[in-house]
C-alpha cells in the first residue's frame, strides 16, 4: 500500500522507507546511475536507481516516459548542489530498493511539460493532457471552489436538492437540446438550460433555501467563455428581498475567494444601475479595473455637417458617444486601423477620432479627418465633456445605441489593457435595475431581458401593460473584472403578475397554459416571495486560475464547434436506434 504521495515527501521523512506509485515523468542516465522523476497528482520526486542493486537497476533500464511503476526506497538528502528549491521534495531523493513496472506506455504524442501544444492535440489526447501539472492544479482548484461553496451554503441553511435532467422544452433564450422519447412517440424531453422553474417550485414546496451545483445545457454559438454543457451554482431562497440576497451572495463569493486563493475582494461591492453601466461603460458587465469612460454626445451632434454623426443623433434609438484615451495621441495609424477593425466585429462601420496635440493652439492643435465637418463650438464641447488633455486621443461611435455601446464598450476594455490604463487585482460590482424587456427587432415584439419569471421593480407592475419599455426589474448581476459571474433576480410569486408578464411578451393564455401551466397553478397555492441567483462555476474557476478559456478548467470540454475531439461526439447512430425513436433523417 502506498505510504506517501511523490510531491509531498520532504526532509521530515529522511531515512524512512516509502512506497510510491506514479508515472515516469523523465528518466536520465548519469554516471552509471539511473535517475527517475516520478510523478503523481501531488508533484514530482527524484528517484535514484543504483547499479549496486542489480535487480532494481535492470528493471529501471527498461522503463520509459509515462510507464506506471511502484517504487520502494529510502529517503535521503540530495547531494550538495543538486537541491531544487522549486519542489517540496527538492531537498531529498529516494534511493530505490525495489521497482515494479505496473504498466508500460506507448511513446506519448507530447511531453507533459510541453507548453507549445495546440489545443486540438491536447483535447484529442485529453487523458494525457490532464496528467500535466497545470491541468491537475486547475481541476483541484475547481474542486476546492465547489467545496467552499457547499460549506458556506450548508452553514447558512441551504440544502442540496437535485432537479430533473429530462424536462420540458420552454423558451429561455437559447435553443434547447432535445431528447426524443421512445415510449411517447413524437414527444421530446429537453435538457435543462437551468433549473429555474424547478427551484421556484421548491420554494412553493416550502424548502426555503435550496442550492445545487448542476449541469446546464444550451445549444448556442460558442465563445471562449461558453460550452454547450456547463456547470451552474444554482441558488434560491424564500422571504429575502433583492438587497438581502445580494448581501448574502457577496459574502459567499468573498468567503470562497479568501478560503481558496487567499484573495480579499474589496467590500462592499459597488452597485451600478444598468442605465449607468451602459451610458458610462457601454456594457452591462464593465471591467472596473479600466478607468476609461464613455462621454455622451448625442445632444450636440444633431445639427452638425458630418452626416454619420447627425443621422445617428437624430434617429430613434441612436447614439453618439466618445471615448477619451489618455496618451492615445501616440497611437500610430496602423494601431488606429487595427482598432477600427476590432470595433467592426461589433457592427461599427468605422472609428472616427481626434488627436489632441496642443489645446493652447485651438483648432490648429487638433488632428483629425473629421475636423472640417464639425463646428468649432461643438468640438469645444467635446473637449470639455471628455476632459481632453494634450497627448490624448478621442474615439467616436455613432450608430444605433446598441452598436455604439457594444463597440465602444469592447474598445474601452481593449484599449485600457493595451495601453496600461487598467489596474491590477479584482474589481467586483453589482449591476442592478435592469429593464424588464428588450425589443426583438426581427420579430417586432418584446422579449424578457433576463427571463420571464423576473419580478418587476416596486411601482413598475402597471408599466407591464401601459409602457413595457420603461418597466424595470428586480434583477441583479454580479460582475468581476468585466465578466458576469452570477445573475439573479427576485421572482414573480403572484399568478396575476406572471400572467401580465406573459401578455407583455405576447404569450397568449393558451400558450402560457400549455408551456407554463404547472407554474401558474403552483403560484396559486400560497407561493412565498422568493428569489435567487446562479453562478457560473466554470467561469469563476477560470478567472481564479488565470485561464484564457473555461476549457482549461473543465475535465472533458467541447470545442467551439460543440465537438468532443476525444470521443468524437456527436456521432451518427444506427438505423435500429433511429427506428426505435421513430426518427427518420432527412438529408439536405
Swiss-Prot record:
GO cellular component labels: cytoplasm
Coiled coil: none
Amino-acid positions noted as binding L-aspartate in the UniProt annotation, renumbered to this chain: 172, 218, 450, 491
Site (Important for tRNA non-discrimination): 30, 81
Source organism, top-level taxon: Bacteria
Enzyme class: ligase
Subunit description: Homodimer.
Functional summary from the UniProt entry: Aspartyl-tRNA synthetase with relaxed tRNA specificity since it is able to aspartylate not only its cognate tRNA(Asp) but also tRNA(Asn). Reaction proceeds in two steps: L-aspartate is first activated by ATP to form Asp-AMP and then transferred to the acceptor end of tRNA(Asp/Asn).
Entry similarity comment: Belongs to the class-II aminoacyl-tRNA synthetase family. Type 1 subfamily.
Name of the protein in its database record: Aspartate--tRNA(Asp/Asn) ligase
Organism per entry: Nitrosospira multiformis (strain ATCC 25196 / NCIMB 11849 / C 71)
Name of the encoding gene: aspS
Amino acid at each position: 500500500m502506498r505510504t506517501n504521495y511523490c510531491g509531498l515527501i520532504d526532509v521530515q521523512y529522511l531515512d524512512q522507507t516509502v512506497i510510491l506509485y506514479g508515472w515516469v515523468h523523465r528518466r536520465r542516465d548519469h554516471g552509471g546511475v539511473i535517475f527517475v522523476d516520478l510523478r503523481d497528482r501531488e508533484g514530482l520526486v527524484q528517484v535514484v536507481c543504483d547499479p549496486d542493486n542489480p535487480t532494481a537497476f535492470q528493471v529501471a533500464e527498461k522503463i520509459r516516459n509515462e510507464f506506471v511503476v511502484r517504487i520502494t526506497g529510502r529517503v535521503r538528502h540530495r547531494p550538495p548542489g543538486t537541491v531544487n528549491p522549486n519542489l517540496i521534495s527538492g531537498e531529498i531523493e529516494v534511493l530505490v530498493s525495489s521497482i515494479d513496472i505496473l504498466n508500460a506506455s506507448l511513446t506519448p504524442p507530447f511531453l507533459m511539460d510541453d507548453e507549445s501544444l495546440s489545443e486540438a492535440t491536447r483535447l484529442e489526447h485529453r487523458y494525457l493532457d490532464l496528467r500535466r501539472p497545470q491541468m491537475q492544479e486547475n481541476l483541484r482548484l475547481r474542486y476546492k471552489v465547489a467545496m467552499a461553496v457547499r460549506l458556506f451554503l450548508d452553514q447558512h441553511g441551504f440544502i442540496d436538492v437535485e432537479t430533473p435532467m429530462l424536462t420540458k422544452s420552454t423558451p429561455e433564450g437559447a435553443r434547447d437540446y432535445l431528447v426524443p422519447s421512445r415510449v411517447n412517440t413524437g414527444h421530446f424531453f429537453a435538457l435543462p438550460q437551468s433549473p429555474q422553474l424547478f427551484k421556484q417550485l421548491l420554494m412553493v414546496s416550502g424548502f426555503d433555501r435550496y442550492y445545487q451545483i448542476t449541469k446546464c445545457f444550451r445549444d448556442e454559438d460558442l465563445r471562449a467563455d461558453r460550452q454547450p454543457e456547463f456547470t451552474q451554482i444554482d441558488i434560491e431562497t424564500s422571504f429575502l428581498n433583492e438587497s438581502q440576497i445580494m448581501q448574502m451572495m457577496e459574502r459567499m463569493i468573498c468567503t470562497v475567494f479568501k478560503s481558496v486563493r487567499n484573495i480579499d475582494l474589496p467590500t462592499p461591492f459597488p452597485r451600478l444601475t444598468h442605465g449607468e453601466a451602459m451610458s458610462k461603460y457601454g456594457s452591462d458587465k464593465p471591467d472596473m479595473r479600466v478607468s476609461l469612460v464613455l462621454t455622451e454626445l448625442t445632444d450636440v451632434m444633431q445639427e452638425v455637417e458630418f452626416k454619420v454623426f447627425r443621422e445617428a443623433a437624430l434617429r430613434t434609438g441612436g447614439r453618439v458617444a466618445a471615448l477619451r484615451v489618455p496618451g492615445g495621441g501616440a497611437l500610430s495609424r496602423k494601431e488606429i486601423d487595427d482598432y477600427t477593425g476590432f470595433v467592426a466585429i461589433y457592427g461599427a462601420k468605422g472609428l472616427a477620432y481626434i488627436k489632441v496635440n496642443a489645446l493652447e493652439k485651438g483648432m490648429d492643435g487638433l488632428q483629425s479627418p473629421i475636423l472640417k465637418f464639425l463646428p468649432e463650438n461643438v468640438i469645444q464641447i467635446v473637449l470639455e465633456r471628455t476632459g481632453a488633455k494634450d497627448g490624448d486621443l478621442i474615439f467616436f461611435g455613432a450608430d444605433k445605441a446598441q452598436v455604439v455601446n457594444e463597440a465602444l464598450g469592447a474598445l474601452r476594455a481593449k484599449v485600457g489593457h493595451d495601453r496600461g490604463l487598467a489596474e491590477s487585482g479584482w474589481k467586483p460590482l453589482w449591476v442592478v435595475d435592469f429593464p424588464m424587456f428588450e425589443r426583438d427587432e426581427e420579430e417586432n415584439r418584446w422579449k424578457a431581458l433576463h427571463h420571464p419569471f423576473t419580478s418587476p421593480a416596486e411601482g413598475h407592475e402597471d408599466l407591464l401593460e401601459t409602457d413595457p419599455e420603461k418597466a424595470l426589474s428586480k434583477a441583479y448581476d454580479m460582475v468581476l473584472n468585466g465578466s458576469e459571474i452570477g445573475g439573479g433576480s427576485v421572482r414573480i410569486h403572484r399568478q396575476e403578475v406572471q400572467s401580465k408578464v406573459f401578455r407583455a411578451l405576447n404569450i397568449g393564455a393558451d400558450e402560457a397554459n400549455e408551456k407554463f401551466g404547472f407554474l401558474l397553478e403552483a403560484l396559486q397555492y400560497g407561493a412565498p416571495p422568493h428569489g435567487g441567483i446562479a453562478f457560473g462555476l466554470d467561469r469563476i474557476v477560470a478567472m481564479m486560475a488565470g485561464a484564457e478559456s473555461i476549457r482549461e478548467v473543465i475535465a472533458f470540454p467541447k470545442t467551439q464547434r460543440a465537438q468532443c475531439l476525444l470521443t468524437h461526439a456527436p456521432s451518427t447512430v444506427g438505423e435500429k436506434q433511429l427506428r426505435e425513436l421513430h426518427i427518420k433523417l432527412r438529408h439536405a
